[in-house]
């Protein structure tokens, strides 16, 4: 009898469990994995004046070129030498363009002929962040060359890493008055979990034949600007390689490499003359460089090493076919080899010690018979 009661009780419990399972309205759904990919901005704290303008700010403010973006940064004095495709230099608080350094993806740009950097050569469509530092910055992990300038304008290009390994292509076309056309193309692909490739190119063409009124005594004529065509373009090839992973998934060693080429063949309109508008002056500027930057971190995050190397070549050719014997024609060439190493030690939280050493070699020559063809070697150190 006791066994029968136990059997009946077990049957009732089993029946209740089955009824409860049938009446359960809670469903289980498996959510797909979500990946969030974004650029992490460093929290910048500095005892010296610091200005930052990122891609979001540029889109919100509606800036269209590098000059317009630099005008939005307090402390910058932008000098525009005029003309379509003309030279634009930056100075900060009266220091002068020669004392204001401009870095491109962490490596300082150089110009051993005039000493002033033309910022109009760099496309705003490729720029991710503009950062202006006046005086000594709290970031001491920099090259000795960057530490030697009174103010530094850092240009950082777009370096986001796609979450997938599919090709990403973006295009843009700008059209304006007086024959202005500027197409832009950018290609990004993550070839593996550690290697990313990016290529971009842009081309700008403009006739610049804008109209104006010419007053000559009691006569007023409608004229157009002549010999003002601009034909320029530049391309970049960027590579990013992450080597070694830490426990948190971050890369311990990283390598960035860049190949850059710029070409600007433009006509120079000259001054306005009465009774004639014939002029034939031309200026052809070219610039090519290759740079690499390797950064490593120790396992205990106490030591950091950064090594940079760069080869730069530039030429500027002026010609005027209307001058007899072409005696005013001249071509200038400049070359630079540059390398830098920086080692930082962080013995404790809030303490850091950095030593940086740079070596550079510059040469300049031209077609002028009186050219001295100077060469220069330099070593810079900072602690």
Q: What is each residue range found by the language model?
A:
Residues 124-170:
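A beta-strand signature from Gram-negative outer-membrane beta-barrel systems
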Residues 100, 126, 163-169, 174, ...:
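Outer-envelope beta-barrel architecture signal
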Residues 206-212, 217-239, 244-305, 311-335, ...:
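Flexible loop and strand-edge segments within Gram-negative outer membrane beta-barrel domains
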Residues 183-189, 237-245, 290-296, 339-347, ...:
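Residues on the lipid-exposed face of transmembrane beta-strands in outer-membrane beta-barrel proteins
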Residues 283-286, 311-383:
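Outer-membrane beta-barrel transmembrane domain signature of Gram-negative proteins
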Residues 157, 173-179, 203-207, 261-265, ...:
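Transmembrane beta-strands of outer-membrane beta-barrel pores
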Residues 23-59, 67, 97, 134:
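Short, acidic, small-residue-rich periplasmic hinge/interaction motif at the N-terminus
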Residues 67, 71-108:
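Extracytoplasmic beta-strand/coil segments of soluble accessory domains associated
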